[in-house]
Amino acid sequence: MNREEMHCDVVKI
């Protein structure tokens, strides 16, 4: 899991 992927999750919510 990359930091950008986590960012995507945060933006998704």
From Swiss-Prot:
Induction: A fusion of the 5' UTR and initial codons of the gene with lacZ allows expression of beta-galactosidase, suggesting this protein is expressed (at protein level). It comes from the Bacteria. Pfam families: PssL (PF22869). InterPro entries: PssL-like. Transmembrane segments: none annotated. This gene lies upstream of and overlaps pssA on the same strand in another reading frame. May serve a regulatory role in expression of downstream gene pssA; in a pssL-pssA-lacZ fusion, mutation of the start codon of pssA to a stop codon in pssL decreases expression of beta-galactosidase, suggesting translation of the 2 genes is coupled. This is Protein PssL. The gene is pssL.
